[in-house]
Amino acid sequence: CDPKKFYRHIFAYDWIILNAFYYDSQYKLLKHIVDKYENKKKKIIVITSTSGTDICFDKTIEADSYKEYSRHKRKLIKYIEKIQQRLVDKPLQIFDVCPDIVDTQMSKGLWVNAKKLKPIEVSKAVQFCLESKFNVNRIVIQKKC
């Protein structure tokens, strides 16, 4: 997945949701958006993950793919925290929707005994951000931790 393929289309949208995980593609897209559009009125919702936080990283999972996923989400969360402070007086808004385990194809076979969020619950948090008249730095949605 080459994020550069999306760059030329971003200007046309006022609302952008970065949800797909492919290594650092979310980070690259977000960085591009901030660099090019920080003075434009846009709402960017980034779906991160509690796996990218110290408190919810699951140390029991040995899979390298999970560790890699968590590492990229952690980097993304740190960037969002930093950039939100810089953008506080700018028209560009960045929202971090940080769900715990979501019942999707990606989580099948993992955390089989844990309560999982439904995708609709995450989409309601996204909707809240899009409709919000104020800035929301991070929404953490949890059932597990």
Could you describe each region identified by the protein language model?
Residues 30-34, 77-83, 123-126:
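Short-chain dehydrogenase/reductase
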Residues 96-97, 111-145:
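C-terminal helical subdomain
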Residues 19-21, 38, 42-88, 98-104:
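Catalytic loop of short-chain dehydrogenase/reductase
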Residues 1-12, 25:
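Conserved Rossmann-fold cofactor-binding substructure of NAD(P)-dependent oxidoreductases
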Residues 27-29, 56-59, 107-109:
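Conserved catalytic-core motifs of eukaryotic protein kinase domains, centered on the activation segment
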Residues 1-4, 31-42:
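Eukaryote-skewed repeat-based solenoidal scaffolds used as protein-protein interaction platforms
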Residues 20-30, 43, 126:
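Conserved internal alpha-helix within the Rossmann fold of NAD(P)-dependent oxidoreductases
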Residues 12-14, 41:
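Local beta-strand N-terminus motif with an aromatic residue
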